[in-house]
């Protein structure tokens, strides 16, 4: 599904470096650091994400560790919303709620401060990349556990062939750069 917005993001693909056989043989890695260092490209990316959510009364943007921390604060600023980090275990100083989820080889855990979300707050969850959707699915569980209302899931890049968006049939999944292989 291609995004609908007035910022033409297709040229931004030329700023994304591809690295074959990383992190292991047979994987083509889409490296966004080359996009991030381009001030105009980064600004266009944030503007396009923000355009999708302006007027939707967003209270908070949640960024998932680690690269969600790059996009989250910038998006929150553009939406006049607060920013909340979703962290790996034992990184937050106050009381937290956590969710453990399965990975290809093992499991991982995410945490959020238990007072980070007030019931009914409208929230956008943001990460750099949508692949299989496992990390975002865990974050959705955290938000719902705290009573937040999910206004959308935002990604800079989506690997369409991994079908991660199929995990979220009832949510607004918004990705800017789509790759089919």
Curated annotation (Swiss-Prot):
The task this protein performs is described as: Catalyzes a salvage reaction resulting in the formation of AMP, that is energically less costly than de novo synthesis.
Provide this UniProt record's keywords sorted from A to Z.
Cytoplasm, Glycosyltransferase, Purine salvage, Transferase
Q: What is the lineage of its organism?
A: Bacteria, Pseudomonadati, Acidobacteriota, Terriglobia, Terriglobales
Q: What is annotated about its quaternary structure and interactions?
A: Homodimer.
Query: Hey, which pathway is this one from?
Result: Purine metabolism; AMP biosynthesis via salvage pathway; AMP from adenine: step 1/1
Any one GO MF annotation of this record: AMP binding
The similarity comment for this entry is: Belongs to the purine/pyrimidine phosphoribosyltransferase family.
Superkingdom classification of source: Bacteria
Q: What class of enzyme is it?
A: transferase
Q: State the EC number(s).
A: 2.4.2.7
Catalytic activity, as annotated:
AMP + diphosphate = 5-phospho-alpha-D-ribose 1-diphosphate + adenine
User: What are the BP-aspect GO terms?
Assistant: adenine salvage; AMP salvage; purine ribonucleoside salvage
Q: Name one GO cellular component term.
A: cytoplasm
Name listed for the protein in its UniProt record: Adenine phosphoribosyltransferase
- Per its UniProt record, what NCBIfam families does this chain match? apt, PRK02304.1-2, PRK02304.1-3, PRK02304.1-5
* Protein source organism: Acidobacterium capsulatum (strain ATCC 51196 / DSM 11244 / BCRC 80197 / JCM 7670 / NBRC 15755 / NCIMB 13165 / 161)
Where is it located?
Cytoplasm
């Amino acid at each position: 599904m291609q995004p609908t917005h007035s910022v033409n993001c297709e040229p931004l693909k030329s700023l994304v470096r591809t690295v074959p056989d990383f992190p292991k043989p047979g994987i083509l890695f889409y490296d966004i650091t080359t996009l991030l260092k381009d001030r105009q490209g980064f600004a266009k990316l944030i503007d396009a994400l923000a355009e999708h959510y302006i007027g939707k009364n967003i209270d908070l943007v949640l960024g998932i560790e680690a690269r969600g921390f790059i996009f989250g604060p910038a998006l929150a600023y553009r939406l006049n919303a607060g920013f909340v980090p979703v962290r790996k275990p034992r990184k937050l100083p106050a009381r937290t709620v956590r969710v453990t989820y399965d990975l290809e080889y093992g499991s991982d855990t995410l945490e959020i401060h238990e007072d980070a979300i007030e019931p009914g707050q409208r929230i956008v969850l943001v990460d750099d990349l949508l692949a299989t959707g496992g990390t975002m699915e865990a974050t959705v569980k955290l938000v719902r556990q705290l009573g937040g209302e999910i206004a959308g899931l935002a990604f800079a890049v989506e690997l369409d062939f991994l079908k991660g968006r199929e995990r979220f049939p009832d949510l607004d999944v918004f990705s800017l750069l789509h790759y089919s292989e």
